[in-house]
Regions:
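N-terminal "pre-motor" subdomain/linker immediately upstream of P-loop NTPase catalytic cores
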Residues: 1-124
Length: 124
């Protein structure tokens, strides 16, 4: 499941979009961006289990974090306080809500995207 990107030639916008799209296609409920000393470890939660997805190098770390915060309506200048945001996403004609939270850590901001697919909820 591990994914590689051409970080030197691919724009961060496309990398973020691909991570989100691919996670949705794989049936993930969460995307975790865990900052480390030298980059970000991206993991996705499928059926309650976290799977390693990709490693983001240090050179892309700040831009990727900023991109996620922009599309979720967060304050990009604030990195010392927790924040919450949201993304409305249309996938094959169905509306998905993506809830985004950021939390400051010693190595940067930890970001979690929760994928909410209301079409999968129980209808009664």
């Amino acid at each position: 499941m591990f994914r590689e990107f051409d970080y030197d030639n691919k724009p961060v916008v496309e990398i973020v979009n691909e991570i989100i799209e691919d996670s949705i296609k794989k049936g993930a409920s969460d995307i975790h961006f865990d900052p480390e000393e030298k980059g970000i470890n991206v993991r996705i939660r499928i059926d309650g289990e976290l799977h390693d997805y990709c490693k983001i190098p240090e050179s892309v770390k700040k831009n990727l974090t900023t991109r996620v915060k922009i599309i979720s309506g967060m304050n990009i200048t604030e990195s010392r306080l927790p924040q919450d945001g949201a993304i409305k996403h249309l996938d094959d004609g169905k509306q998905l809500d993506l809830r985004v939270s950021s939390l400051p850590t010693i190595h940067g901001e930890k970001i979690v995207i929760r994928i909410l697919d209301y079409s999968m909820s129980l209808a009664g």
